[in-house]
Amino acid sequence: MYYTGAEGSVFPGCYWGSYGYPLGYSVGCGYGSTYSPVGYGLGYGYNGCGAYRRYWPFALY
């Protein structure tokens, strides 16, 4: 299952962060972002579809 933030939508051709992967990890475009602090839920980075800044509405591992 994939999440893209509070809006809950999935960007075309890109899955931004998936449950079970490290925080801030992008799947689909083949690039990983920087890791966000555990429990804080903030991620920055790039993926194959361009730069993004992403917020997690809940804490993952």
From Swiss-Prot:
Disulfide bonds: none annotated. GO terms for cellular component: cytosol; intermediate filament. Keywords: Keratin, Repeat. Expression restricted exclusively to the cortical cells of hair follicles. Interacts with hair keratins. In the hair cortex, hair keratin intermediate filaments are embedded in an interfilamentous matrix, consisting of hair keratin-associated proteins (KRTAP), which are essential for the formation of a rigid and resistant hair shaft through their extensive disulfide bond cross-linking with abundant cysteine residues of hair keratins. The matrix proteins include the high-sulfur and high-glycine-tyrosine keratins. Belongs to the KRTAP type 8 family. This is Keratin-associated protein 8-1.
